[in-house]
UniProtKB/Swiss-Prot annotation:
Protein name from the UniProt record: Protein IBD2
Record key words, sorted: Cell cycle, Cell division, Cytoplasm, Cytoskeleton, Mitosis, Phosphoprotein
Record PTM Phosphothreonine, positions in chain: 211
Subcellular location field: Cytoplasm, Cytoskeleton, Spindle pole
Gene name linked to the record: IBD2
Protein source organism: Saccharomyces cerevisiae (strain ATCC 204508 / S288c)
Higher taxonomy: Eukaryota, Fungi, Dikarya, Ascomycota, Saccharomycotina
Similarity comment: Belongs to the IBD2 family.
An example Gene Ontology biological process: cell division
Source species, domain of life: Eukaryota
Role according to the record: Part of a checkpoint which monitors spindle integrity and prevents premature exit from mitosis. This cell-cycle arrest depends upon inhibition of the G-protein TEM1 by the BFA1/BUB2 complex.
Sequence segments annotated as region (Disordered): 1-20, 223-249
Polar residues bias locations: 1-14
InterPro entries reported in the protein's UniProt record: IBD2
GO cellular component, one term: spindle pole
Amino acid sequence: MTPTNQSSGTTNASVEVLSEDGPMPINVMMQEGVKALTKILSNQLQDRQAFQNAPHAMQFVIRNGGKALSNARLEELKDALPKMDSLSLEDELAKIDGQSAYHIDSAEEKETFESKIGQIASRNSADFIIEEDLQNILDDDLKDSELNLDGEEAEIIFDYESQELDTPDGIGEKISQMIESVLPGGFGSEEQGGLRTVTNVEDLDVAEEVTDIDHDTVDAARLHGDGQHSISSRKHSRSKNSKKNGHVRRHDFYDESRDHKSCCPHHHYENLSKLRNYYYHDFEYISRTENRVPDFSVLVNESSPMCLFCEYYMVFGEPPRNMIKWYNRTFGYNRMPNPPRDEQDSRKRNR
C-alpha cells in the first residue's frame, strides 16, 4: 500500500492485487484487500489522529491495467439521479468495467439500468440509494462473480475523504459493507454472515472479529496432508472433515523465493509426541526488523494454498500475533487433527 498526499490535504491509499495467471475469484481479491487495508489504515489514522479532525469517507474502486473503471458508470448514475450527492454516490457504488463482468453494452441495457435507478430514487425521495435497492440492481446486472484480469495487473483502491467514521476500528466494517454491496449476493448466503476482517493491531480484540469469519474463508485454511506423497512433499487441500488447522511452527526467515513446504510446515510431524501430550500450537514465526510494503504477489506466485497465518506472514513479513493468540485461546487444546493414517501405520511398524 502506498499513501499519496493530494493537494487538497487528503490521503489516498491503495492495495494492489496482481494476477499473472488470468482470472481469479473476486472474493479472494476483496478479502486480501480488506485484511491489508484495515491493518495499514488503522495504524496510519491512529498515528495521525485523523479522526479528531475532519470526517472521512471511503470508496471502493477496481482498476484493470492501471485504468480507472468507475468514472463512466458514476457519471451515468449521476445523470439518472440528479438529487444524489456525488460523495454519497461514490461512497456507495463501485463499478467493474472493461474486460470484467459488469458493463453496459447497448443503449437498451443502459436505458433499462437507468430506469431501475430512477424508480428507486423516486420511491425513496432521498439523497442516497439504500443498500437493499442497490443490491437488487447489482444482482440483476452483475452476473459473474469472477473478475477477469486481462491486463498486466489490477488494482484495488480504497480512498477515504469526507464521510464520518467513528474510530479506526470502523474501517474494516465499512470496507466489508462496501464490498458486499457490489458482490452478487454478498459474500454468500451462509447464516453465519459476511466477511469480518482480521488485523494485527495490538489493541484490537481479534477474538470478537474472527469468531464471525465466513465459513467459506475458514474452510480455505483447513488443510491436510496428501497420503499419496511423502511428508516433505505433501500438497495442501481443503479438508471438509478436519475441525481446525494443524500448524506446528516456523523455523527460518521470510524469503519470497522460499518453497512453501518450509513456510507452512503443518504437515510435518517431527514434534508429534509433544503435540499429542499438550495439544497446543507454539507458533514461532521470526519477525523481520525492517519495514516493507506488503507484497501480495507471493500469494499469486505460490502454487499451493497456504494457511491463513503463513499467508499473512508471507504478505506482511511479520507474524499475525493476535490471530495466533486467538487461535491458541480458542483451539489450542484438544483440537489438534490426527496425523495421516500412513504416518500412524509407519510409527506402529517402527515400534
